[in-house]
A protein has these predicted regions:
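Active-site or metal-binding loop neighborhoods of secreted/extracellular toxin and effector enzymes
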Residues: 226
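Short, flexible loop/turn elements at secondary-structure junctions
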Residues: 22, 66-68, 93
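Mg2+-dependent endonuclease catalytic cores in nucleic-acid-processing enzymes, primarily RNase H-like
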Residues: 75-213, 232-238, 242-252
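Active-site-proximal structural scaffolding
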Residues: 11, 67-68, 96-97, 187, ...
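Gly/Thr-rich phosphate-binding beta-strand-loop-beta motif of the actin/hexokinase/Hsp70
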Residues: 55-79
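ATPase catalytic-site recognition across NTP-hydrolyzing enzymes
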Residues: 1-64
């Protein structure tokens, strides 16, 4: 029972921490990384850092995290047949909502796509001191095609859903590009944030931490999980799947 619980939390990294074979013992990966083994496998298959075109006819989504201390992270994703194409990533802090709305408009223009839905976490429906929600403020700024993803009661369920989706994913080269922080410091790109998102080590007596480490990498990881949870809740159903509406992106 303990091993099953640990495997649920740690995913493929369980093999490095608690190996069953010598090969598993010497497998590489960021210690405690939640998505690291998936990203590593994608790299080995040539699916990270790929150059491909966005499909203007494919279902297109943004997935958000509205983090603590005014941090916001957003992914741009297309569904292409049975695959998920992660086109772009953006993260910033100490910016007004209008800044992010303008970024969404820039994405649509620069990538030649129309966003089907902007997927926001549950706290976007929370009302501020003036009785206005984040979603309503977005609408006032012209972003009306919004879906709020219900709050999950189990963060690991969403994490495991994202692990499954990652196995069918491609990441554009721009999602690896370094970013600049509010003070001009260099920050990791989207893919690197996913690789560095990690679980807490077991406590005294092997007690399992109930939540991952919350740090500068968790905002981008949580935004990706927003997409996965929207998928599992069926919020993307009925939008087509790329096989019906689009064509597979050309890669070179």
């Amino acid at each position: 029972r303990w091993y099953a619980r640990m495997a649920r939390v740690m995913g493929a990294s369980m093999k490095q921490e608690y190996p069953g074979t010598p090969q598993e013992a010497f497998a590489t990966g960021e210690e405690g990384s939640i998505y690291g083994s998936r990203i590593m496998a994608l790299r080995e298959r040539g699916r990270v850092g790929v150059e491909f075109e966005a499909d203007p006819d494919a279902p297109t989504f943004t997935a958000w995290d509205l983090g603590l201390s005014d941090h916001t992270a957003i992914w741009l994703v297309q569904i292409m047949g049975d695959s998920f194409h992660w086109l772009d990533h953006y993260a910033a802090s100490q910016q007004p909502l209008a800044h992010y709305v303008e970024k969404m408009k820039d994405w649509e223009k620069n990538h030649g796509v129309a966003v089907t839905f902007h997927l926001l976490p549950h706290d976007a429906a929370r009302r501020d001191a003036h009785g206005i929600s984040y979603v309503e403020n977005m609408g006032r700024l012209g972003l009306v095609n919004v879906r709020v993803v219900p709050r999950t009661t189990d963060v690991w369920r969403g994490i495991n859903t994202l692990r499954e989706l990652l196995e069918r994913s491609f990441f554009h080269a721009r999602t690896q590009e370094k970013a600049r922080g509010f003070c001009g410091e260099e920050e990791p790109g989207g893919v690197e944030h996913l690789e560095l998102y990690r679980s807490r080590p077991p406590g005294v007596g092997g007690a399992i931490a109930e939540s991952p480490v919350h740090d500068g990498h968790s905002h981008t990881a949580d935004a990706a999980r927003t997409f996965a949870e929207a998928w599992s809740h069926g919020l993307l159903h009925g939008t087509g799947n790329g096989r019906e509406r689009g064509r597979r992106a050309r890669m070179w």
